C-alpha cells in the first residue's frame, strides 16, 4: 500500500527564465473562518476607546502649525496668506480672461473642435 503525503513534490533544478518568457503565476486559496473574522473585529474595536479618549489632544494647534482642521477658512492662520491666495487666484483668472477673448464666441457647436 502506498502512503499519502501532504507535501508538494520537490524539483531538483530551478526553472530557467528567459528574458522574453513570462513567469508562472501562482494562485493561493485561503479559507477564512468565522473565528478569524471575529478576531479582526475585536482587535479593531479594542482601539476605539483609546482613539476617543485621545481625540481632544488631536485638536491642539500651535502658532507654528498651519491651521489645518482648526475651522479657519482654507487653513489660513495669517492674513498675509489669505492675500497671497487671493492674489494668485486673481492673477490666474485675469490671464485666462484676457486670453479667452481671442478664441471667439463659439456660437457654432463645432467651433471648439478644430485643431
From Swiss-Prot:
Domain of life per record: Eukaryota
Pfam families linked: PsbW
Main location: plastid
Location within or outside the cell: Plastid, Chloroplast thylakoid membrane
Membrane topology per record: Single-pass membrane protein
The name this protein goes by in its record: Photosystem II reaction center W protein, chloroplastic
Keywords: Chloroplast, Membrane, Photosynthesis, Photosystem II, Plastid, Thylakoid, Transit peptide, Transmembrane, Transmembrane helix
Entry-linked InterPro entries: PSII_PsbW_class2
Transit peptide: 1-30, 31-59
Topology feature Stromal, residues: 100-115
Residue ranges crossing the lipid bilayer per the database entry: 79-99
Cellular component per GO, a single term: photosystem II
Organismal lineage: Eukaryota, Viridiplantae, Chlorophyta, core chlorophytes, Chlorophyceae
Subunit annotation: Part of the photosystem II complex. PSII is composed of 1 copy each of membrane proteins PsbA, PsbB, PsbC, PsbD, numerous small proteins, at least 3 peripheral proteins of the oxygen-evolving complex and a large number of cofactors. It forms dimeric complexes.
Amino acid at each position: 500500500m502506498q502512503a499519502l503525503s501532504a507535501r508538494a513534490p520537490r524539483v531538483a533544478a530551478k526553472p530557467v527564465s528567459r528574458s522574453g518568457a513570462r513567469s508562472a503565476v501562482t494562485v493561493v486559496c485561503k479559507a477564512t473562518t468565522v473565528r478569524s473574522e471575529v478576531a479582526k473585529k475585536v482587535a479593531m474595536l479594542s482601539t476605539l476607546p483609546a482613539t476617543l479618549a485621545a481625540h481632544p489632544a488631536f485638536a491642539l494647534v500651535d502658532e507654528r502649525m498651519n491651521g489645518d482642521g482648526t475651522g479657519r477658512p482654507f487653513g489660513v492662520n495669517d492674513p498675509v496668506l489669505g492675500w497671497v491666495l487671493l492674489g494668485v487666484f486673481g492673477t490666474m483668472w485675469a490671464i485666462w480672461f484676457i486670453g479667452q477673448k481671442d478664441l471667439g464666441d463659439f456660437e457654432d457647436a463645432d467651433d471648439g473642435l478644430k485643431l
